Amino acid sequence: MAGLALVHDYLLVLRGAERTFAAMTEVWPEAPIVTLLYDEYGTQGRFAGRDITTSRLQRLGVSQSNFRALLPLFPTAARRLKIGRYDRIISSSSAFAHGLHKPRGALHVCYCHSPFRYAWHEQAVALQEVSLPLRPALRLLMRRHRAFDLRAARRVDQYIANGHITRERIKRYWGRDAPIVYPPVDVERFSTGEPDDYVLFVGELVRHKLPDLAIEAAAEAGRRIKVVGTGPELIHLKERYTGKAEFLGRVDDKTLERLYSEAAALVVPNVEEFGLVAVEAQAAGRPVVGINAGGVSETVIHGDTGLLVPEGDVSALANALRTDFTRFDSGDISQHARRFSREVFQTRLREVVESVSERPYRATYAISHAETSPRAVAQEHPANP
């Protein structure tokens, strides 16, 4: 048994987690890829030509638009992924990949983007997104997923966190320590431009990203806002905010680069585990208005590369958006973003993987029933920068 395999939850689109995984595959270019689902078109051909093994769910013709319907099947499918006889497995997980069954004697290192948010720290959000009759079934499903996570956490040899808030959640929910390796940003592809007067929102249009908060704050500040992204909230947002926002949908990389470079600022209204878009905007020399918690508080220097405001405060967000952003130095901002470059990520990731001991895992502390109860896991904890 020899060699190394790379595992990711599912490769259906090319967002932050998938771009991070793409950078991981460059560190080990000959390693096979194992994933629950794969869409070459949706991932813009980024993984074309690689040896990719998928789960049996691939036969169902699942896409980004309907894959959530298979949520109850993903844990079992993850456990049954055909890994092969490799002595090292590196998974990239936001929910399922860390639960794979590794070959006997293999070492499993998991790069964790976040514990599955709807099973842990955002249960209330998940319940609000389904009708009342379905909520008991969803509660049961999430309880089963927490049990799945706890079993997985006993088998993973080493977790790596993408930021302080993820590290805290890994320790609180699963009783594991995790070094931090910040996700990569392809900073070289961005350039500064002549800023316009609009602010920009970039992200999946789902409730936990709070696009409505960004639009309302921009309207209160008298700012134009352009919204990049698609998702289940798109129709609702268009109906509610007609004339208050310009919805651009999904855009290609070149268009996104231009939008970043010409924006007055990027607005990030929610708490992110890392917040890739915040670093991308800074790489383009644009300041970021975000929440003083989570990943954005780790990547944005208040007053120098952006402005940080309290969580959930629309008025504070609007007040920040009234700022004259031309006072920020685009050169200093883009230089700051280079500390999150792809090269820095890849070097650090390789160092951590190579340093992992093959000694049996020992829990850092016991996980009590109270810590895994719905009341406990629904509570949010600020990051310790």
Please report, for each region that a protein language model flagged, where it lies by residue.
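Nucleotide-activated donor-binding/catalytic signature segment of Leloir-type glycosyltransferases, i.e.
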Residues: 235-255
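Active-site donor-binding segments of glycosyltransferases and PAPS-dependent sulfotransferases
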Residues: 30-98
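Conserved donor-binding/catalytic core segment of Leloir-type glycosyltransferases
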Residues: 187, 191-228
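Short hydrophobic beta-strand element within catalytic cores of glycosyltransferases
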Residues: 287-292, 300
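Membrane-proximal helix-turn-helix segments that form the acceptor-binding/catalytic region
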Residues: 127-159, 167
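Acidic donor-binding loop of glycosyltransferase active sites
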Residues: 261-273, 286
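A charged, aromatic-enriched C-terminal amphipathic alpha-helix characteristic of glycosyltransferases
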Residues: 325-367, 371
